[in-house]
Amino acid sequence: MGSSGSMVKPISGFLTALIQYPVPVVESRADIDKQIQQIIKTIHSTKSGYPGLELIVFPEYSTQGLNTKKWTTEEFLCTVPGPETDLFAEACKESKVYGVFSIMEKNPDGGEPYNTAVIIDPQGEMILKYRKLNPWVPVEPWKAGDLGLPVCDGPGGSKLAVCICHDGMFPEVAREAAYKGANVLIRISGYSTQVSEQWMLTNRSNAWQNLMYTLSVNLAGYDGVFYYFGEGQVCNFDGTTLVQGHRNPWEIVTAEVYPELADQARLGWGLENNIYNLGSRGYVATPGGVKENPYTFVKDLAEGKYKVPWEDEIKVKDGSIYGYPVKKTIHS
């Protein structure tokens, strides 16, 4: 393993490690079990190398891989919580770290499965469960998440939220995390190289627009079809990149994160305090600012009427291009 970034836990804040996990080639349940043991081994070895480590993050699909022929089968799906998260919890407790893990989750109601992330604390408790709000359609078959965007307490005064891969391309997702109090947004991804530039750009913009840190990590390596770019990235709350990984599988990207500085910016900044200014427009001219919503898309989305002007001309609206059956439209 190589590494980029910091080595030592700061006096305030916390030390994080983003693992550029090699893209798993998974053909059977035995392969999944092998990945789980490899992830657990990585937790312990990384903690040994970085004794001050408090938060370790693994990418999307690091547990079950991206075998599109099998990824929705009973053999491949997991329950959350379940035996797999119990094993991760034991490892986090033994190494005294917070851990972020990716699980393709069996739908407990019997419907389509979810793409899920969990955070487990150093006591081995699952403190956050998130289901991907925006699956990467039309490639992914996952059901859109139904748990909102939860926030939990983390190390060093942090308030943590997690988004998954394509979620980070929507500024609304990062804004929702910040609006609910997150000062650190974690993004776990399984992107191939086609969107690496856009991935890095949105990691920075999500940080800047919301005055919060972003910790982002992607799978790395070649699976026989695509190359996954790794490039773990830690962005400061001002949108600058603090640490940037390379395209190496097994690279460990570490950084010192100071959530208190993001909190201070949110309280003390005037110019560019945009997470506040969005709801207090023009407060110099209008005491307290204008509160009314001026945005048509926000109103329409809230009313279930979101529709772009060119919607009737859009060519791809189902998963048939990737072999998924066309399902009847359901209007909620």
From Swiss-Prot:
Q: Which UniProt keywords apply?
A: Hydrolase
Q: What is its EC number?
A: 3.5.1.49
- Cite the PROSITE patterns for this sequence: CN_HYDROLASE
> What InterPro entries is this protein classified in?
Aliph_Amidase/BUP, C-N_Hydrolase, C-N_Hydrolase_sf, Formamidase
Q: Where is the active site?
A: E60, K132, C165
Catalytic activity reported: formamide + H2O = formate + NH4(+)
Recorded GO molecular functions are:
formamidase activity; N-carbamoylputrescine amidase activity
Any one Gene Ontology biological process term? putrescine biosynthetic process from arginine
Q: What class of enzyme is it?
A: hydrolase
- Keyword presence, Hydrolase: yes
Q: Which residues form a coiled coil?
A: none
Q: Which residues form the CN hydrolase domain?
A: 14-259
Keyword match DNA damage: no
Superkingdom to which the source organism belongs: Bacteria
Q: Which family does it belong to?
A: Belongs to the carbon-nitrogen hydrolase superfamily. Aliphatic amidase family.
Q: PANTHER family annotated for this entry?
A: FORMAMIDASE, NITRILASE C965.09-RELATED
State the protein's purpose.
Answer: Is an aliphatic amidase with a restricted substrate specificity, as it only hydrolyzes formamide.
What protein name applies here?
A: Formamidase
Q: In which organism is this protein found?
A: Bacillus cereus (strain ATCC 14579 / DSM 31 / CCUG 7414 / JCM 2152 / NBRC 15305 / NCIMB 9373 / NCTC 2599 / NRRL B-3711)
